[in-house]
From Swiss-Prot:
The active site is at 135 (proton donor/acceptor), 139 (proton donor). GO terms for molecular function: 4-hydroxy-tetrahydrodipicolinate reductase; NAD binding; NADP binding; oxidoreductase activity, acting on CH or CH2 groups, NAD or NADP as acceptor. It catalyses: (S)-2,3,4,5-tetrahydrodipicolinate + NAD(+) + H2O = (2S,4S)-4-hydroxy-2,3,4,5-tetrahydrodipicolinate + NADH + H(+); (S)-2,3,4,5-tetrahydrodipicolinate + NADP(+) + H2O = (2S,4S)-4-hydroxy-2,3,4,5-tetrahydrodipicolinate + NADPH + H(+). Its EC number is 1.17.1.8. This is 4-hydroxy-tetrahydrodipicolinate reductase. It is an enzyme of class 1 (oxidoreductase). The gene is dapB. It is found in: Cytoplasm. NCBIfam families: dapB. Coiled coil: none annotated. (S)-2,3,4,5-tetrahydrodipicolinate binds at residues 136, 145-146.
Length: 242
């Protein structure tokens, strides 16, 4: 594949390295600071990257959202977290004319975790639920896009949910519909996500721990390889392999 990268931070640098190791070609990058000495051609617009087969985005909403308003038909893999509703709304529109893929976490293991939640939440009705995520000290957004994804899965399965982000502001006992959401930032933690079900005299945890950021880069590459074979449409890990 010939790949256009949107953003060239730590994640897309990994994508570039792994892509070239696997025989793919990086045709260029879209970055906000074009004066840096990048190893690839820089572009302002997606449509400028002639010859690209697919674009892979690991950037931020400030860079990505204006690009999604442009006129292009290049298959697009998006992994940006933050401003999820705005991004997915624009991707839904673009999917009417080209294939697009979105995931808040490019790890297939996280996708499996969401499927486990779909089984566990109905079976553990009445258990208190807490969501905890931990990342490195350079991650900006909190809670992580992945934790939001896990919360969204739970919200679809329960009649009423009340997210609680800051307990020190609540001077009352925990309510049955509360879902505690906690974010930890420190060191070089790649990414950890825990779903805690607390019942009477027992707890059950579902946990995913990323041991290398390569899992996200490889996940994006595998999604791109599938996406370029697909007709127009909106794809996620739920349907990309159909």
């Amino acid at each position: 594949m010939k790949i256009l990268l949107i953003g060239y931070g730590a994640m897309n640098q990994r994508v570039a390295r792994l892509a070239e190791e696997q025989g793919h070609e990086i045709t260029g990058i879209i970055v906000p600071d074009k004066n840096n000495n990048y190893p690839y051609p820089t572009f302002e617009h997606i449509s400028d990257a002639e010859g690209a087969d697919v674009a892979i985005d690991f950037s931020n909403p400030e860079l990505l959202l204006p690009l999604l308003d442009e006129d292009f038909e290049l298959p697009l893999v998006v992994a940006t977290t933050g401003e999820k509703e705005k991004i997915t709304e624009k991707l839904e529109e673009l999917s009417q004319k080209m294939p697009v893929f979105f995931s808040a976490n490019m790890s297939y293991g996280i996708h499996v975790l969401t499927k486990l939640l779909e089984v566990a939440v109905p079976l553990l009705e009445g258990y208190d639920i807490e969501l905890i995520e931990a990342h490195h000290n350079k991650k900006v957004d909190a809670p992580s896009g992945t934790l939001v994804k896990l919360y969204d899965v739970i919200k679809e399965l329960k009649d009423n949910v009340n997210p609680v982000y800051d307990r020190h502001e609540k001077n009352e006992k925990r309510q049955p519909d509360d879902i505690g959401i906690s974010a930890i930032r420190g060191g070089t933690i790649v990414g950890e996500h825990d779903v805690l079900f607390a019942g009477v005299d027992e707890t059950i945890e579902l946990t995913h721990r990323a041991q290398s950021k390569d899992i996200f880069a490889n996940g994006a590459l595998k999604a791109a390889e599938r996406l370029v074979t697909k007709p127009k449409g909106y794809y996620t890990f739920d349907n990309i392999n159909n």
